[in-house]
Regions:
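A conserved FAD-binding loop/helix module that cradles the flavin
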Residues: 510-530
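Active-site-proximal substrate-binding core of FAD-dependent oxidoreductases
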Residues: 278, 532-560
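Rossmann-like flavin
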Residues: 121-226
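Helical element adjacent to the flavin cofactor pocket in flavoenzyme catalytic cores
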Residues: 232-283, 295
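A glycine-rich dinucleotide-binding beta-alpha-beta segment and adjacent secondary-structure elements
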Residues: 205-219, 390-396, 449-512
């Protein structure tokens, strides 16, 4: 019996994770990647003997990764508990390998401590490591007036984590009713106010308000606008830690590619999709607004047509609907709706290698360097869309953990500066190089990397133009739609297209949102939707496989 076929557009974390899951569901899956190597935003750059992860660098919830590597052909395990009791109770690994036995066959994952060192503009810092007593000690030193507030924040963030992540994290909000059912809980938890406002309930010191609200910037969210449900990030990291893949995030990408191919999947590079092909139910051109619309495959930029029973976009939601599907096939995701959606911020990212001999580098693996303004800078980036005279940055130095990414006596680093997306109208060819020079001068002159400009060996940078041109992100956004309340849950793009049958979304633009754990959750949610829609036999969807072609009993259709 011929297996159903699937095409996934894009080989980011979402596309690779879903590819593995579709192979485990019994599909024959092809991933089409526009670039010359896998990863999408997680592309890896090799330059002058240095290796740089161009995108995600923070790994949390390692059991999500273990779950993928443990899958096998025709055994999707979608019916197993999403958060087994043992996984939650075991907590985080603090030393050695933090990947499970299946993961460790493909990639070595290790814990990082502290999670982040957060530098304030006055030179003081806070080591954020998830240890409650260490956190109390640092608050005592920096803001003793906020000790009692931390205890209340800790308890309330845990309640949000337990309800919002453990219980509701995998909820697919496909209709208004599914969202209305959870609103009372969110109101009770005070999780619909903004995250920054939530932090200010507990902390009076501006430094503590920043420490306990900044993390949504790592998933494209403005702390002044995202709902307080994101306070659960504190407890997600506290529960499972922050981790790193030896060899860089690219090593994890390669592990996913290897697993996908071992399960029989195919990945093609330099394969840009120009159009998602749509017909009516009879395979003809749809006529009129009431005609059915079914995804039948894709057409590549070179004209090649590929047929499939399922088409999934791991690309940007806005770009998918505006560029790949003709407007006449879209009613819900119309041009007007897509263009009115708020996109996340963009980034200027500087990748640089430098000589380390004789350098006493007092930095950590992950460093957050906050500028003199917090709320005002966020408003400049997200609302005014101007390039401010000041900036904050995330400085990543993986060679402190993994020297293999650079030649001996050298470091490979990148620093990421949040900036407005291309709705700003800024000419990045002009302002980009000037910002890069300011950022590198700051790191040098403020003593973070003394003598940096003389020590530089290689450098490369990207601006919002890279995200728009190379990654096909609408307006050059870096994280998909902005995760404000009005674009969350039901109001976030749906994993199953409302316009075209057999078309699905996965990744940062879909539910539940951006960030590596959310993207892997998105893959599982989309796999469940596909399993339901195609009546996948329960023995495949929920556990051990059956022989291809074995007839399914109606009562055994997946009910996850």
């Amino acid at each position: 019996v011929k297996r159903k076929s699937a095409i996934i557009i894009g080989s980011g974390f979402g596309g690779l994770a879903l590819g593995i899951r579709l192979q485990s569901l019994g599909f024959d899956t092809t991933i089409l990647e526009k670039l010359d190597a896998p990863g999408g935003r997680a592309y890896q750059l090799h330059l002058g003997g240095f290796t740089f992860d161009m995108g995600p660098t923070v790994i949390t919830v390692p059991h999500f990764i273990e779950e993928l590597f443990a899958l096998s052909r025709d055994a999707a395990n979608l019916g197993a508990p999403d958060f087994p009791t043992g996984v939650v109770a075991a907590g985080r690994v603090r030393e050695g390998l933090s990947g499970g036995p299946a993961t460790s066959k493909y990639v070595q994952i290790v814990p990082i401590l502290p999670f982040y060192r957060i530098y304030f503009h006055d030179g003081s810092f806070f080591d954020y490591d998830g240890d409650p007593q260490h956190t109390r000690d640092q608050i005592q030193a920096l803001a003793p007036e906020d000790l009692a507030g931390y205890e209340r924040f800790h308890d309330d963030a845990r309640a949000i984590f337990e309800r919002g992540f453990l219980q509701l994290g995998y909820t697919h909000f496909g209709d208004v009713g599914s969202m209305l059912r959870v609103v009372p809980d969110l109101l009770k938890l005070d999780a619909v106010r903004t995250l920054f406002s939530f932090a200010r309930k507990y902390f009076t010191n501006p430094k503590m308000q920043q420490v306990f609200s900044f993390e949504t910037l790592l998933v494209g969210g403005n702390p002044l606008k995202v709902p307080a449900i994101y306070a659960m990030i504190h407890f997600v990291e506290k529960t499972w830690g922050v981790h790193y893949a030896m060899g860089g995030t690219g090593a994890l990408v390669r592990g996913f590619v290897r697993k996908f191919e071992e399960l029989g999947g195919t990945i093609r590079y330099n394969a840009e999709v120009a159009r998602i092909d749509v017909t009516d139910a009879r395979g003809r051109e749809p006529r009129g607004p009431l005609a059915s619309r079914v995804a039948r495959g894709v057409t590549l930029a070179g004209g090649e047509r590929l047929a499939a029973d399922v088409v999934v976009s791991n690309g940007d939601w806005a770009n998918t609907y505006l560029k790949l599907i003709e407007g006449k096939h879209r009613r819900v995701n119309s041009d007007a709706r897509v263009k009115l959606a708020r996109q996340s911020m963009s980034l200027v990212v500087i990748y640089f290698g430098f000589r380390a001999e004789g350098l006493n580098l007092d930095l950590r693996h992950h460093n957050i360097i906050l500028g003199p303004r917090y709320a005002e800078l966020l408003t400049d980036i997200f609302d005014r869309k101007v390039l401010a005279p000041d900036f904050s940055q995330y400085l990543h130095i993986p060679t402190l953990t993994d020297p293999s990414l650079a030649p001996p006596e050298h470091h490979a680093a990148y620093t990421l500066v949040p900036v407005p997306h291309n709705g700003s109208g800024l000419n990045w060819a002009v302002v980009g190089p000037k910002l890069v020079e300011r950022v590198l001068a700051f790191l040098d002159e403020r003593g973070y990397i003394p003598g940096l400009r003389e020590r530089l060996v290689v450098q490369h940078w990207v601006t919002p133009d890279y995200f728009e041109r190379d990654l096909a992100s609408h307006l050059g956004n870096a994280f998909g739609v902005e995760p404000i309340l009005a674009q969350s849950a039901y109001f976030r793009p749906h994993n199953r297209s409302e316009d075209v049958k057999n078309l699905y979304l996965v990744g940062a633009s879909a539910q539940p949102g951006a960030g590596t754990p959310s993207v892997m959750m998105s893959a599982k949610m989309t796999a469940r939707e596909i399993a339901r829609d195609f009546g996948i036999h329960a023995s495949i969807a929920n556990g051990a496989g059956r022989a291809p072609g074995e007839p399914k009993a109606e009562s055994e259709t997946v009910g996850v």
